[in-house]
């Protein structure tokens, strides 16, 4: 990891792990100068190593993307030497809220680390200014006028949509697809609705293929649709979403412009947490959302299909995104291929589980759903999974629709203490079942 203390604040971040192929995710000063990006090391850090690592992290968060397939210099950050405690805290002050910096200090003190060094490092660095990267991201001014050869070549695209009891919303999906400026695509719908209504697919000016799947199995549906797809590119989509007419075109253009393998369109949810600020500009993507991502079909042929162990659970798309990243594929967060995610209350995965993976539907059900711990433990290890539990459990006590309310998130932390016996049971159950999934 870039800084050791990131293991407390971001224990399961994709970029804590070294990929097979490094695309200069964390560039050196020389790499930035080569690409004409004006960033300077922060002299407030006491060590040169910390200055270079902070510079690399800032470049990442500002949206630095190396566009030269041959020009990228591998990052030198995958092995982390011991850094001065003051520099560790300075990095936290610059990138996280005061709550999280205090959280790390408490964890370090409880862990019996040197209290003098920890408190001194905390206090000496607290004058650091919090960085708000979204206010001045790296821009790509040549993107609007970029004439994409990929778009001009008109590759065939397959849009994959699993659906379950959402015919009303599926109509809006089809209307948006009819309006697309890019026309060379097919649509495959795997319908799990009861009762199945074949007439829902009549009358649309689209190349629609569909079939009924009796089993309510989301990942099986996507896998079978991908196997049946004729497209050179697969565009994964949800049945409760809205997009602009240039949606497909922007996905393809972004792949071409950044020489990428995946274009992860941002998803603007109408329910839950606020929209992340980095959704407004291009950057390396640290997630994969199967409700809005375009990728080369050959990726599925090389690293496999979705892991069906996530069936009726959560984060199967997160696992695939991490798998693609580790295999060396370039994944771009694309603000110009956004979708509005309605997150309607009926149908879909909501019908089979809770609003998200950290809030069980049953009071004594596992928290989080076992597939989340399966993902964390499989790729990041048990220690990182435990740090993520410690960070994420308290706010999960509050219902999903209040996820963006900071005051209620604090209330959730206190409630988690009152409900500790129940929460510990839920976590034990999830840990046990995730272990069974790993065997």
Description of each model-found segment:
Residues 1, 13, 242-279:
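Conserved donor NDP-sugar-binding/catalytic core segment of glycosyltransferases
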Residues 54-57, 62-87, 334-359:
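Active-site donor/metal-binding and catalytic loop motifs
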Residues 234:
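Short aromatic/hydrophobic "clamp" motif used to bind/position activated sugar donors
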Residues 84-148, 378-439:
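Non-catalytic, C-terminal membrane-associated alpha-helical segments of glycosyltransferases
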Residues 175-184:
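Short, acidic, metal-binding catalytic loop of nucleotide-sugar glycosyltransferases
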Residues 213-229:
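Glycine-rich, basic loop-to-helix element that forms the pyrophosphate-binding segment
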Residues 46-54, 312-322, 334:
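Acidic donor-binding loop at a coil-to-helix junction in glycosyltransferase catalytic cores
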Residues 11-14, 64, 74-75, 108-176:
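N-proximal low-complexity "stem/linker" segments adjacent to membrane-targeting elements
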């Amino acid at each position: 990891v870039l800084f050791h203390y990131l293991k407390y604040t971001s224990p399961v971040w994709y970029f804590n792990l070294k990929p097979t192929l490094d695309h200069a995710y964390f560039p050196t000063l020389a790499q930035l100068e080569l690409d004409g990006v004006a960033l300077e090391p922060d002299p407030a850090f006491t060590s040169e190593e910390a200055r270079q690592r902070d510079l690399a992290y800032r470049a990442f968060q500002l949206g630095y993307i190396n566009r030269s397939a041959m020009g990228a210099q591998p990052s030198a950050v995958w092995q982390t030497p011991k850094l001065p405690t003051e520099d560790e805290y300075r990095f936290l002050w610059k990138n996280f809220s005061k709550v999280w910096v205090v959280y790390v200090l408490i964890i370090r003190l409880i862990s019996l680390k040197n209290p003098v060094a920890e408190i001194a490092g905390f206090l000496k660095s607290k004058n650091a200014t919090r960085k708000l990267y979204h206010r001045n991201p790296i821009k790509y001014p040549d993107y609007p006028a970029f004439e994409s050869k990929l778009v001009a070549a008109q590759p065939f695209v397959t849009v994959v949509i699993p659906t379950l009891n959402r015919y009303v919303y599926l109509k809006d999906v089809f209307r948006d697809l009819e309006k697309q400026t890019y026309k060379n695509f097919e649509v495959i719908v795997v319908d799990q609705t009861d009762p199945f209504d074949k007439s829902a697919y009549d009358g649309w000016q689209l190349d629609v293929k569909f079939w009924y799947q009796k089993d309510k199995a989301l990942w099986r549906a996507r896998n079978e649709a991908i196997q049946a797809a004729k497209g050179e590119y697969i565009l994964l989509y949800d049945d409760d979403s809205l997009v602009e007419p240039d949606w497909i075109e922007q996905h393809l253009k972004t792949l071409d412009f950044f020489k990428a393998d995946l274009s992860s369109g941002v998803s603007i949810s109408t329910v839950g947490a606020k929209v992340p600020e980095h959704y407004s500009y291009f950057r390396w993507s640290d997630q994969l959302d199967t409700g809005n991502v375009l990728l080369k079909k050959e990726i599925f042929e090389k690293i496999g299909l979705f892991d069906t162990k996530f069936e009726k659970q959560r984060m199967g798309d997160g696992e695939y995104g991490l798998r693609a990243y580790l295999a060396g594929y370039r994944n771009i967060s694309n603000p110009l291929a956004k979708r509005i995610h309605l997150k309607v209350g009926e149908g879909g995965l909501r019908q089979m589980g809770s609003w998200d993976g950290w809030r069980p539907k049953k009071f004594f059900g596992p928290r989080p759903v076992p597939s989340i711990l399966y993902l964390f433990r499989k790729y990041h290890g048990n220690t990182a999974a435990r740090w993520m539990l410690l960070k994420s459990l308290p706010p999960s006590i509050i219902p999903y629709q209040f996820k963006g309310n900071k005051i209620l998130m604090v209330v959730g932390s206190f409630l988690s203490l009152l409900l500790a016996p129940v929460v510990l049971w839920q976590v034990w159950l999830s840990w046990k079942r995730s272990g069974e999934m790993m065997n």
